[in-house]
Design a protein with these regions (language model features):
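C-terminal edge-of-domain segments
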Residues: 151-157
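Nucleotide/phosphate-binding catalytic cleft detector across ATP-hydrolyzing
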Residues: 1-30, 34-149, 167-212, 216-268
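Amphipathic beta-strand/beta-sheet edge segments enriched in Tyr/Trp
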Residues: 160-163
């Protein structure tokens, strides 16, 4: 039986009525896929895998590698499965789908996402850089006067970004080739810490971020947070429910057309 979870979102993310009806927020990660529609009240959380590949290969097929589409046919099947589940929430057909993509997503990567969504849902996909959505989901003021510093650590990718004026102004990315049942192996932590420290050193002198917020499954690893604090010498904290920060942010952007317009200015 498929590992599918429904996790209720925090009420504050659902207080305001949808600005536009019929949306689906979609966060397809290397290991997990999260989605939520305008007619639902919970996040659907399932493995980023499908069974019964066309080549007859036994076992699950994982369409993504390091956060980007590696198997377009399998990715299409996964998106179809996730989006068709939205029919049960009464949000079908959606007017639009807001989907997260990595900072390093190429035009081909973005096209693969858009093609799959258009074929299944019959509407255009609006693409948002995943760390930007995660910052919104973590409660950061991405349009405030002070830049934000965020590190998103997923199963196949770590992305450290600087957000200023509602857009990502600088970023560093590290592909993660190995994870364990409890997250990153200890030897991989140094690479993530060094990457984030290098990004912080590139920032102008003033104004400085108030600290670093960590999202993604890696935010649950205490050794990572401890090493970041020691190396960066700034406040470091994990977002609430860090694995769901991106999908929360995507939903919030769907409810805030003004903020969405700024966040997606370079992501369509």
């Amino acid at each position: 039986m498929a590992d599918v979870r429904s996790i209720h979102t925090h009420p504050r993310h659902l207080e305001q009525p949808p600005a536009r009806r019929g949306f689906v927020a979609l966060d397809v990660g290397t290991a997990r896929t999260r989605s939520m529609s305008s007619g639902g009240c919970a996040v659907a959380d399932r493995p980023s895998a499908i069974t019964g590949g066309p080549s007859g290969v036994p076992g699950p097929v994982r369409p993504l590698r390091h956060g980007v589409v590696a198997d377009p046919a399998a990715y299409l099947r996964l998106v179809r499965l996730v989006l068709l589940e939205a029919r049960w929430s009464g949000a079908w057909p959606p007017e639009r789908v807001l989907a997260g993509v990595p900072v390093t997503a190429t035009p081909d990567d973005r096209r693969a996402v858009g093609t799959a969504v258009a074929e299944v849902a019959g509407c255009e996909a609006t693409l948002v850089e995943g760390p930007l959505a995660a910052a919104v989901g973590a409660g950061l003021d991405i349009a405030g006067p002070r830049p934000c510093l965020l590190l998103d650590v997923g199963a196949g990718l770590a992305e450290a970004v600087v957000i200023d004026g509602g857009v990502i102004t600088d970023a560093a990315v590290l592909q993660l080739s190995a994870t364990t049942g409890t997250g990153l192996p200890l030897y991989a932590l140094d690479g993530v810490v060094g990457m984030t420290a290098g990004l912080l050193r590139r920032l102008p002198g003033r104004p400085r971020p108030a600290g670093l917020v960590v999202t993604g499954g890696g935010a649950r690893q205490a050794p990572l947070l401890e090493r970041l604090r020691a190396a960066l010498r700034v406040p470091v904290g994990a977002a609430p429910e860090p694995g769901h920060a991106t999908i929360r942010g995507l939903v919030s952007l769907c409810l805030r057309p003004d903020l969405e317009a700024r966040a997606t200015a370079g992501g369509r």
